[in-house]
Amino acid sequence: MKLSKRIENLPPYLFVQISKKIAEKRAKGEEVISFAIGDPDLPTPKHILAELCKAAEDPANHRYPETEGLPVLRKAMAEWYEKRFGVKLNPDTEVLPLIGSKEGIGHAAWCFLDPGDVALVPDPAYPVYAISSQLAGAEVFYMPLNKENNFLPDFNAIPQDVLSKAKILWINYPNNPTGAVAGLDFFKEAAEFAAKHNLAVCHDGPYSEIAFDGYRPVSFLEADGAKEVGIEFHSLSKSYNMTGWRIGMAVGNAKMIDALRRFKSNLDSGIPQAIQLMAIAALNGSQDVISQNCAVYQRRRDRLVEALRNIGMEVTAPKASLYIWAPVPEGYTSASFATELLDKTGVVVTPGTGYGTSGEGYIRLSLTVPDEQLEKGIAKLANFKSQA
């Protein structure tokens, strides 16, 4: 049987590879402490689970859901956005619930790109931006994110011949993997750049509620002109510890939202209705979980930054996101450091090159590690230094 070229050319997904390595080590009876994947270890709040249990018992929720989501859910999403960011959205035309924001990111490439078009993708970045664009038949132009520019793309460095074919601009702040943040000035610049070059902006903002030291991330849609050129993907996964329930949203430009809705309606049958009702409970209920999460992650951030500095790594504490972006010690590449750390200590980190060539020289560490495991990992890092 011959597979399609798009599948044959598809690289292995980074986090699947990491999970396999972890499983192999554990199968040998070796202890593994993984800082590799940003999957919250904290539980979904009880009042949200209670709504799920109640909804699951109602036979009305056992049938096919509406692809575009319950009207009451879209209303809750719009109200949450206005309350959190001051952004007004029409729940009927500017809000689309998703089976996790990753679904919408994957679909967006098919909605806004044709074969031969160019997608402008940050480097380093969440791999799905580039992979989904390539699956849609587009070429990818990588925009380097460098420390010298605060891990923001330099739009002026994009060649004119690339811009003439570019159709989509991917951006993501607070950023994965760098932990960098962006303000309204940058988002306004992005919106103006997109308007000038007729680009569709897709901003991925799932980490807006994970922030530290009093910092409050902003939404791309708060910037003047943003809704005219783009959409924002958001997720309940990180904010409410709901990665396993798979629910997110796309909001913003009505034409782009309609395109996603049309594409989605032909590929899936929507989000299970009980999970939609669960999401309403999350958005409309107590938001205490968000501040509680941030307190836990900030404590872990501080412990891990201290531990990394103690082994000679010049680490900047992130203002937001679930990640620490750490430069590797002199004499190592990203991959060689990650490999040696795993082999000698059982500590798993993600090499920066897994997110793009501009990630060379860095590793990413996640804060979603239970406190006991975190302390074991810190002890192993100290032991690694003593062996070096």
UniProtKB/Swiss-Prot annotation:
Its cofactor is pyridoxal 5'-phosphate. SUPFAM superfamilies: PLP-dependent transferases (SSF53383). Pyridoxal 5'-phosphate binds at S101, K102, Y126, N176, Y207, S235, L236, S237, R246. It catalyses: (2S,6S)-2,6-diaminopimelate + 2-oxoglutarate = (S)-2,3,4,5-tetrahydrodipicolinate + L-glutamate + H2O + H(+). GO terms for molecular function: L,L-diaminopimelate aminotransferase activity; pyridoxal phosphate binding. Pathway: Amino-acid biosynthesis; L-lysine biosynthesis via DAP pathway; LL-2,6-diaminopimelate from (S)-tetrahydrodipicolinate (aminotransferase route): step 1/1. Disulfide bonds: none annotated. It is an enzyme of class 2 (transferase). InterPro entries: Aminotransferase_I/II_large, DAP-NH2Trfase_DapL_Desulfo, DapL/ALD1, LL-DAP_aminotransferase, NHTrfase_class1_PyrdxlP-BS, PyrdxlP-dep_Trfase, PyrdxlP-dep_Trfase_major, PyrdxlP-dep_Trfase_small. It comes from the Bacteria. Substrate binds at Y13, G38, K102, Y126, N176, R364. Its EC number is 2.6.1.83. The modification N6-(pyridoxal phosphate)lysine is found at K238. GO terms for biological process: lysine biosynthetic process via diaminopimelate, diaminopimelate-aminotransferase pathway. Keywords: Aminotransferase, Pyridoxal phosphate, Transferase. Involved in the synthesis of meso-diaminopimelate (m-DAP or DL-DAP), required for both lysine and peptidoglycan biosynthesis. Catalyzes the direct conversion of tetrahydrodipicolinate to LL-diaminopimelate. Belongs to the class-I pyridoxal-phosphate-dependent aminotransferase family. LL-diaminopimelate aminotransferase subfamily. Homodimer. This is LL-diaminopimelate aminotransferase.
